[in-house]
A protein has these predicted regions:
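C-terminal accessory/binding modules appended to enzymatic or scaffolding proteins
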Residues: 57, 387-399, 405-407, 411, ...
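Iron-sulfur cluster-binding cysteine motifs and their immediate structural context
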Residues: 91-96, 497-503, 591-610, 621-634
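Short, small-residue-biased leader/transition segments that mark boundaries at the very start
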Residues: 2-6
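Short amphipathic, charge-patterned alpha-helical segments
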Residues: 69, 256-258, 408-423
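Hydrophobic alpha-helical positions that pack around
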Residues: 151-152, 281-407, 419
């Protein structure tokens, strides 16, 4: 069920500004200031309600805190607020207490009594729930002192973890729709396009095309109907940037879509989002409904005569529907298959009408640009890549989560300064950027700047923002196989190069990882990859071979070891190693035998054990449990 918005419709830009002032007065505690008469609560407790923390039972934490405060009669002086993602997903559930900004991590419902007793009654910190700075015994009391946050600059994520995304008044308090008001009251189409061109913003969905030019092209075509489409179909493995924006600040996207509609002369927008994002869908539905109720969507927005509304279209999770022409076909209710280009969507898009498609992060940045001005955005980043970029960090990295950094930040800074380095003291091996369409960059390219052009020059691409980190135990042939397996499975099948070509590549990679590789296989892979990249119909097919080409470029010796020596240097490919116990190191503790899931290890107490190679499934459990380094892969 949706709550009813108890505000009258906003009929002018001036009314919106007045509402912003009134609502911000209720949130002074979150700004580190004293409470006001508008909201007398002495503390505001922000609890992450993003997908990551929700999966770790943050809703139970919130419910337990609310119940405890009510029982203690403290619910009037302490306000509990659900927010979107803070970014530090590996520490969830996260709770931040204002006005001091105390950052508690890995909070459970059972911790609530102690938090209320110590923090709210006695004014003491619950130190065991504070973040411990790596390499020290020091506790960080707030986000400003946590290295993960120190090199970040939040533009697209500016309100995530700050506001309740299900209450439009909190978004308005943080200047939501002010950029729209500015555009509607002081700018025409040419002014809006020039603002985007001056900002230097390029599409964050992977292509990096100048957004101002895209809007300019759509403006240039005349039609009785035009459309604005938001691409929220985030299909890259390990990517969750767009989901987090919609979960934490959906109004930033809605506002930018309305600005786009005003610019190109469209009165209808669509958000295409995958159904696998239930929280994002729910919050987007709430945001659209509340924006309509308050008069920021629908007819005569802010009394300017501009009409614009937004509907949601759910996708079924097909990776190919991230390609804009396939997405538009899916919105039309047809099978999601790419269309030949030209004509481009700006000329013939949704239902053959002029359309522009922008992804979630791009739109979140656009609303910031119209709030702060083009120069503010352009002052961040590099000469050709302005602003910031959001990355979803995953894989073999200590600080898994969502980060937003200025363009030009190096890969090393992201992985080590923000990401906290590689777990277990293992060596960094590669970072995959750009998802299945990108490439793996090795250790000697760690100082590569993260911007559109530098990544392409290095042999990868920006993509939508997935960043998967690999260590010395990862096999690069197996990694290439994983991504090709994904793209082959997700191929729409419309064109032969992608449908059949990726299947042939996958067959060769599978053969190599099973120890059946032959001389000439590498050359076959290169020829197939180049043919597919030049002849596939859409960008997804054209870039499908990139993981193979990148790993061949930087890790060719691993392919050669698999083929010529029948060895996997990383010890990952099960067909190419056996588990062995060194009798001189084995102490006969029986720990490996007791944990083996198939009973492949035999031996008596205090005597060397033996692994039965016939029974062994090479799961690695024995290797993880051995305390004496007696087990190895050979």
């Amino acid at each position: 069920e949706f709550r009813r918005v108890l505000f009258r419709s906003i009929e002018s830009f001036e009314e919106l500004k007045a509402m912003q002032v009134a609502e911000r007065a209720k949130m002074t505690v979150r700004d580190g200031l004293a409470p006001t008469e508008a909201n007398l609560a002495k503390h505001q407790v922000l609890i992450c309600a993003g997908t990551g923390c929700t999966s770790n039972k943050s809703a139970e934490v919130k419910a337990a805190l609310e119940a405890k405060l009510a029982a203690e009669g403290m619910d009037k002086e302490i306000q509990v607020v659900q927010t979107g993602c803070f970014g530090f997903c590996s520490l969830g559930p996260i709770m931040v207490v204002y006005p001091e900004g105390t950052f508690y991590n890995k909070v459970e419902a059972k911790d609530i009594d102690e938090i209320v007793e110590k923090h709210f009654k006695n004014g003491e910190l619950v130190e065991r729930l504070l973040y411990t700075i790596p390499g020290t015994k020091e506790h960080a009391k707030d986000m400003k002192h946590i290295p993960f946050f120190q090199k970040q600059k939040r533009i697209a994520l500016r309100n995530c973890g700050t506001i309740d995304p299900e209450k439009i008044e909190e978004a308005i308090a943080h200047y939501a729709y002010q950029g729209l008001g500015r555009a509607l009251t002081t700018m025409n189409s040419q002014d809006i396009i020039q603002e985007l061109l001056d900002s230097g913003i390029r599409g964050r969905g992977g292509g990096g095309f100048p957004t101002g030019l895209k809007w300019k092209f759509a403006t240039g075509y005349s039609a009785d109907q035009k459309y604005v489409v938001c691409n929220a179909d985030e299909g890259d493995p390990g990517a969750f940037m767009d989901r987090s924006v919609l979960e934490g600040d959906p109004h930033s996207v809605i506002e930018a879509m309305a600005i786009g509609g005003y610019c190109i002369g469209a009165n209808q927008g669509y958000v295409y989002i995958r159904a696998e994002y239930p929280i994002a869908v729910h919050r987007l539905e709430i945001a659209i409904k509340e924006a309509r109720e308050i008069g920021l969507l629908g007819k005569n927005i802010m009394g300017t005569g501009f009409d614009f509304d937004i509907d949601i279209r759910l996708g079924a999770g097909a990776f190919v529907c991230g390609e804009e022409t396939a997405l538009l076909t899916s919105v039309e209710g047809k099978r999601g298959e790419p269309r030949p280009r030209p004509p481009f969507p700006a000329e013939k898009g949704l239902w053959n009408k002029p359309t522009f498609v922008n992804n979630v992060e791009t739109l979140a940045c656009i609303s910031y640009i119209f709030l702060k001005g083009a120069q503010e955005f352009a002052s961040v980043g590099t000469e050709k890549s302005k602003g910031t970029k959001v990355f979803a960090m995953s894989g073999k990295i200590n600080n898994i989560g969502l980060v937003e950094v200025p363009m030009g930040t190096t890969l090393r800074e992201i992985i080590y300064d923000i990401g906290g380095g590689i777990p277990g003291g293992k060596a960094f091996k590669a970072a995959q950027t750009g998802g299945p369409s990108g490439g793996c960059l090795p250790a000697d390219l760690l100082d590569t700047q993260i911007d559109f052009d530098s990544l392409v020059k290095a042999g990868s691409m920006m993509g939508s923002g997935g960043l998967i980190v690999m260590d010395e135990t990862d096999c690069m042939v197996d990694i290439a196989k994983f991504f090709v397996e994904f793209t082959q499975d997700e191929s729409c099948g419309k064109c032969t190069p992608c449908r059949i070509g990726t299947k042939r590549i996958l067959e060769i990679l599978t053969k190599i990882t099973e120890g059946k590789g032959e001389e000439g296989d590498i050359e076959k892979l290169e020829a197939l990859a180049k043919n597919i990249s030049t002849s596939a119909l859409c960008a997804l097919g054209q870039t499908a071979p990139n993981p193979v080409l990148a790993t061949l470029k930087f890790f060719r010796e691993e392919y050669e070891a698999h083929i010529r020596d029948k060895k996997c240097p990383a010890g990952k490919c099960k067909s190419l190693f056996t588990m062995v116990i060194d009798p001189e190191k084995c102490k006969g503790c029986t720990l490996c035998a007791r944990n083996c899931p198939v009973g492949a290890i035999t031996g008596t107490v205090r005597n060397p054990h033996v692994i039965d190679a016939e029974k062994c499934i090479k799961c690695g459990v024995c290797l993880d449990n051995c305390r004496f380094g007696a087990i190895s892969k050979q």
